[in-house]
Amino acid sequence: MPRPLPHLRPAPLPTLIALALCAWGQALALQSPADETPLQLRGSRVLGAPAKAGDKPALVISAGKLSAQADQKAEGAGGVELRYGELLLRADTLDYRVVEDLANAEGKVNISHKGNVFTGPALQLYVSRFEGEFLTPSFFLGATGGSGKAKVIDFIDSDHLSATEGTYTSCPAVDNQEPDWQISARRLRMDLAANEGQADGAVLRFLGVPILAAPSLSFPLSSERKSGWLPPNIFLDNRSGFEFGVPYYWNIAPQRDATFTPFVMTKRGLGLDSEFRYLEPGHAGRINVDLLPGDRVFGHSRWSLKLNNDGGFGDWRYRLRSERVSDDDYWKDMSRRVESQTPRLLASDLNVSRHKELSWGVIDSYARLQHWQTLQGKDALSQFDTPYQRSPQIGVRVTTAADEAVLDSFRPWGRKARLEGSLELEYNRFDLPGSALAGQARGGQRVHALGHVAAPLGGEAWWFIPRVSVNAAAYDLDHAQADGRMRMSRVMPTLSIDHGWVFERDATLFGRDMRQSLEPRLLYVNTPLRDQANLPNFDSAPKDFNFDSIYTDNQFSGVDRVSDLHALSVGATSRWVSTAEGEEVLRLGAVQRFLFRDQFVTPDGQPVTQRFSDLLLAAAAHLEERWWADGTLEFNPESGRSVRSVLRARYAPGPFKTLSVAYRYARAQSEQIELAWQWPIYGQPVAQRSQTSCGGAWYSAGRVQYSLRDKRLTDSVAGFEYDAGCWVMRFGLERLSTGRAETNTRLMLQLELVGLSQLGSNALKVLKDNVPGYRRLSSDRSPSSDFLP
């Protein structure tokens, strides 16, 4: 039976409820028959039924020994628990003063509050307002997995606390062992509502060595952005030497922020990188300005400017993309600061468009300004023709389909056909930037019209699409052509018929049930010959010869060139799809073009008299979950040799394990092999280790390209990663080709403190951009592993 309590004054109702629950649980245990499972009371960190909004939660105290005086105090000893809303307090002894709402707890005191846990020897706490003092506690924050210790923690309210002589880390606690990294501070303040921490007199230690000291250091308690200094950026390359920069992040408003990074390069001098981002109701964008005044190596100031903006007004949308740099060698010396995929050709592009859907079709109106900066350099052999600028481009495009009344009257072969058509009218003013080569033809004006009418027929397993299209253009040039003309025009009609089928059957492949398809396709094209040698070429370029382009009616992109094709493309694709998973397991394809007459308007300007084009073959396989492979081959049947080929294979047996190999060949141009990987090489992965240690595992990651033709490495990156669970170290070497005999070699070092920040150059981005299937080692851990704006 429960031990009788001393005779005291009547206790408050919550205390009596706790005592009654204790006695009821013990009585049930005594009365339960031996053959039945006894009912048990189980502890919980929160009350099962939360208080209603506006209601004050009940305060419940339970203990092995409990005494109470009504409306004055309650004293407990031996496994004491105090529950109040989201608060659960455990201690060896507890003295609760009712009037003051003050709890004094001693001996193995443990607080659980909103998922956070605090443990220490002595606590004084005003319960309802969660205000008090905890002596020499340790703590754990549930939102981030971070933990620490302090001499004293002052609870200001339920969302704010201040720790004297405190520490913070995301490494798991190990008895008698310092964490691999931690922040120690004279005073540590935490705003749990805003998810941010502030360390005054802070020192960041890594493996016991101080690596950063600051009068004040802010850090995140979640993935939300906040103002403050970020860990430094560290770079080392052969052109600029050692670079050290310290970013400051300014969280201006929820929809605006900025980052300023003063830096120093040992070879070049001092500079400043800046970025401003905004997200407004009508528009969003980013502005980057990078400055290097008085470059000691180059002899002049260097800069770059990047503008990105998207927005709209009414039915109209606009898009701005612009990148400019100070000089032709900027892309070599400051490659990290150039974003363009073509670093020697920088665009400034402003597009304005309107999309309007009507009952009979769609009208697209648009206007564009496009200018270029070409970084030619002094090497004449590496210089290239500059694309023409559009100043401006204005057009309208109408797309429509005939209504049902028209369709009912048009029934070839007894089937209803769907008439559709489009018309594009456009004006362009073309000119050349100042960096254009002297031999390039000057600009001019062009008006063109592109139109087509088609009558698609088909069913579930076939289609037949006859199509008539017209490409008409008129020119007014700034300088006369070779024949003396400045004004000229031409009209190019084209007839095409696209016909295909889809046949399916049940099949088996390597013992697996499959659904196999056979998809033959024919494309007939007839475009008459028009002499285009004396016409300007402002925007046309040859299309790559592949499975997509062979099924088009023009071998050129743009408007100015139209190939005089009279040809039939014949091909077929077969697919095997798993009936169980619905995934494509195998795909095989072949296609070839047959010419009915010689072709004179060609990509290389040489007439084509060969009746059969090169044969294109393609295959892709995913026969097993861990393996992927694909390849394409362009084969010349007349010479019996391959013209181009690409072979690729990838093996990914599990997380953080990927290996890919590629071979690329273009006859008389290039032959290259590529190896990319991410692979564990030593140690036990974090997911398989005990959580009581930060023991590590080594990984290797990288991509290496080797030119068999030139017998040298081209653009490559290779390095190692060490994952200790609560921190990740990455270091590697990146090699970029910047000319026929020039390279830029960069050493990268990055320390990622999981739950805090990344220290060093962004090796992570380099690996993600270069390694197919790369996965960040800490991706399954703290939500704020990257404290980067």
Language model: regions and residue ranges:
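Gram-negative bacterial Sec-dependent N-terminal signal peptides
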Residues: 2-28
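N-terminal amphipathic/hydrophobic interface segments
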Residues: 30-165, 182-185, 189-201, 260, ...
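N-terminal targeting/secretion presequences
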Residues: 2-7, 30-31, 35-49, 55, ...
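Generic N-terminal simple sequence motifs
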Residues: 6-10, 29, 34, 211, ...
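Short, Lys/Arg-rich amphipathic segments at extreme N-termini
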Residues: 17-21, 63-64, 497, 503
